[in-house]
C-alpha cells in the first residue's frame, strides 16, 4: 500500500497538474482568439466572394464554381473538425481546470501511511514487549531457584548496561567526530572569508594610494600652472609697463618736437617780418641780403627736419599703440587659456577630492576588518599569497562556487539534522513511555512490598489467612515453588521466609530504581542533545542567512547573474527581517560622527538631507542653482563685453588722435609753407 501511494505521489508530481492547467488555460485563450480571427476571416472571405461574383463574368464564374464549391466543402469539413476538436478540448479543459492537485493530499497520505506504519511497528514492538513481559512473568512464576534467576537477571542487566554504554560511547564518538568536522569546516570558511577580505582591503589600499598619488600630481600640476600663470602675468605686466613707458617717452618727444616746431614757426614768422622790413628798405647792402637768404634757407632746412622727425615720432606712436593692442589681445587670449586650464584642473581636483571623499570609509572598513580578524582565526600565508596573485574576477568566481557548495552542504547537513532531530524525538517519546511503564511497575512493586511488610506474625489462624489473601498470586506461587509444599496451608509464613522474600523484593526494587534513574539520566541527556541540536540548527540557520548575504553581494557584482529558488527566497525574507550586526555598528559610528560635528556642519548636513528628501525642495534647489549659474555667466559675459568695448574705444580714440594729429600737422605744414612763399 505504501509503495502504491509513493508511486502515485511520484507520478502525480511528475505529471504536474498545475502546469498542465496553466498550459490548458493558455491554449484555451489562444483558441478563443483564433475563433475570433477565423470568424473575421470568414466574413472577409464571404465579402471577397461576393465581390468576385459581382466583378467576374458569368462564364468565368461557371468555370470556377466547382472549384469554389470543393474548396468550400473542404473548408466546411475542416471547420467542422476544428469545432469538434475545440469542443472536445473545451470539455476536457472544463473538467480539468477545476480539478485540485492531488500531490499535497498524496504527500499527506504518504506521511500518514508512514506514521501508520511507524505506529504499527510501535504496536508490534509493544506487543513483543508485552509478550516478553509475560514470558518474564511466566519465568518468574516457573523459576524454582531464585538465586539462579537473580544471577541471570543480573547478567542480562549487565549486558544491557554494557550495550547501552557501548551505544552511548559510539554516539559520543560520532558526535565528537561530527563536531570536529564542523569545526574544521567553519575554520576553513573563516580562513577563506578572511583571505577574501584581506585581498579586498589590499585592493582598497592600492586604490587609495593611486588616488592620493593622482591628487598629489594634480596639485603639483596646478601649483606649476599657477606659478607659470603668475610669471607670465608678471612678464606681461612688465612688458606692458615698458611699452607704456616708451609710449610716454614718444609722447614727450612728440610734444618737444611740437614745441620746437612752434618755436621754429615763430622764428620763421619773425624772419618773414624782418624780410618785409628789409624789403621796405631800398638801400640795403648786398651782404645783409645774403645773410637773410642764408638764414631763411637754414631755417627751412631745420623746419623740414623737424617735420620729418615729427612724422617719424607719429609713426612710432602708432606702431607702439598697435603693438600694445596686439599685446593686450595676446595677453587676454593667453589669460583666458590659462583660466580655462585652471578651471579644468580645479574641476579635476574637485572630482578627485569627491572620489577620495567617497572612499573616506577606508578607516572604517579597516577597523571592521580588524574586528573580523580578532573574531576569526589567522589564515595561512601561502594561501593568502596565492589568492592575492589571482585577479578579482577569479577570486569572486571561486568564492561564489565555494559559497554555493557550502550552501549545498549546509542544506544537506540541515536535512540530516532535521532527520536526527525527528529520530531523537521518537526516541524521547519511547523513553518517556518506557519510564512511565517502569514507574507504574515500581509503584506496583512498592505496593506489594508494603503489603508484605504489613504482614506480621499472626496470633490466630484466621488473621494469618486473612493477611495472606492480600499477597499477590505470582509472589505466592514463587514462594510456594521456592520453599516447597511442606509449608502448612493454614499456617503463617516463617520469619526467615518472609525476610528472604523481603530481601529479594527489596533488591529487585533497588535494581528497578537504579534502572529508572539511568533511564531518567538518558532522558535528560537526550533532552540536552535535542537542545544542542536545536541551537546548532539555529546557528546553521544564521550561517545560511550570512551565506545568503554573501551570495547577494556576489550577485550584485556586474556581469554575474544567477537564479533564485525557494530556499534563497526563504533566506532572503529572513535576511530582510534580520539585519547584520555590523549595520548597527555602522549606525552607531555614523551617529557618533554626527554628534562630533560642529553646529554649522550639523546644520549643513540637516539642510542637505531636507533638500534631498523632499521633491519640492530638490526642484527649488535645482532651479536656484541653475539661476545662480546663469547669473554668474551673464556677469562674466558683461565684464568681458565691457573690457572689449573699452579696448575698442581706446583703439578708436588712439586712431582718431593719430588721424587728427597727422591732419593738424599737415595743415600747419601747409600754412607754414604758404607763409614762407608769401
Swiss-Prot record:
Gene Ontology, cellular component aspect: Golgi apparatus; Golgi membrane; nucleoplasm
Keyword annotations of the record: Coiled coil, Disulfide bond, Golgi apparatus, Membrane, Phosphoprotein, Transmembrane, Transmembrane helix, Transport
Compartment(s) where it occurs, according to its Swiss-Prot or TrEMBL record: Golgi apparatus membrane
Topological relation to the membrane, as annotated: Single-pass type IV membrane protein
Membrane spanning residue stretches: 620-640
Pfam families: CASP_C, CUX1_N
Modified residues (Phosphoserine): 586
Cytoplasmic side: 1-619
GO BP, sorted A to Z: intra-Golgi vesicle-mediated transport
Coiled coil: 67-450, 502-556
Effect of residue 629 to L: No effect on subcellular location
Lumenal side: 641-678
Stored InterPro entries: CASP_C
Consequence the record notes for mutating residue 624 to L: Retained in the endoplasmic reticulum
Quaternary assembly: Homodimer; disulfide-linked. Interacts with GOLGA5.
Function: May be involved in intra-Golgi retrograde transport.
PANTHER family: CCAAT DISPLACEMENT PROTEIN-RELATED, PROTEIN CASP
Protein name, per record: Protein CASP
